[in-house]
Amino acid sequence: MGTLSCDPEARLTTVPLARRVADGHIPETGLRKSCGIATLENGSGPGLYVLPSTVGYVNHDCTKAASPAYSLARRPSEAPLQDSSPGPVYFLDPKVTRFGRSCPPAYSMQGRAKVRGLEVTPGPGAYSPEKAPPVRQRNAPAFTLGSRLRQKPPDTSVPAPNAYTMPPLWGSQIFIKPSSPSYTVVGRTPPARPPQDPSEIPGPGQYESPDPNTYRQRRPAFSILGRPRTPRPLEDTPGPGTHNPEQVTVNRARAPAYTMGIRHSKRASTMVGDTKC
């Protein structure tokens, strides 16, 4: 069954099937789709969206429950298995259990030890305790006369006492020794006499004394300025009509504006609504 077409006459197409499908023709009858229905089918098809798969385990859709998956493997070989293990050649100690070693105590019998010969040690009669002085009593001094000691030849490598050059103790030259008093003799100083010329006497301004504010409480300081400027004469002062307050827009969006309405009639009553409702 075909669909309606915008053309006055529906005609069959002789183009291949793949081209008719791409052009939007119906492959069963070969009729072109109508204009109204074709505009409704311009959207993307189901194959355009790449949704995650719901089959398998890898990249499975997390919003869907996973279906059971099965794997097909080949049939196992029926050939006899070749045993390559060493077999029961391991020796397991029967005394070792999973709780530890379980066995009665065992003892070993050894041969007689070889007897050593008697040691040559002094007997009880070899000691003479009576010859020993009492331990807790004081003894008389005892001396021994020996041969004369051999004298060593004098050592010539040691310097003589006059070979040292000691620093003098005059002045403060050795810091570990107290220095002796030192004096210096200079020439006679001229007597202090006042100058004959008064111009040679220094004045108060010639002494470089520091500022007293540096080591005493700071004194008050004052500054002398010039005479203040006289005010302008009265004739130069602007009058009230010079200012235009209505044009000031510094502190507001626009200048204030006022409207003058008509005078209300004295006979007009006040509009009061019904208060009983």
UniProtKB/Swiss-Prot annotation:
Organism: Mus musculus
Disordered: region residues: 181-277
Pfam families reported for this sequence: SHIPPO-rpt
UniProt family annotation: Belongs to the CIMAP family.
PANTHER family named among the record's database cross-references: OUTER DENSE FIBER PROTEIN 3-LIKE PROTEIN 2, SHIPPO-1-RELATED
Domain of life per record: Eukaryota
Alphabetical keyword list: Repeat
Name used for this protein in its record: Protein CIMAP1D
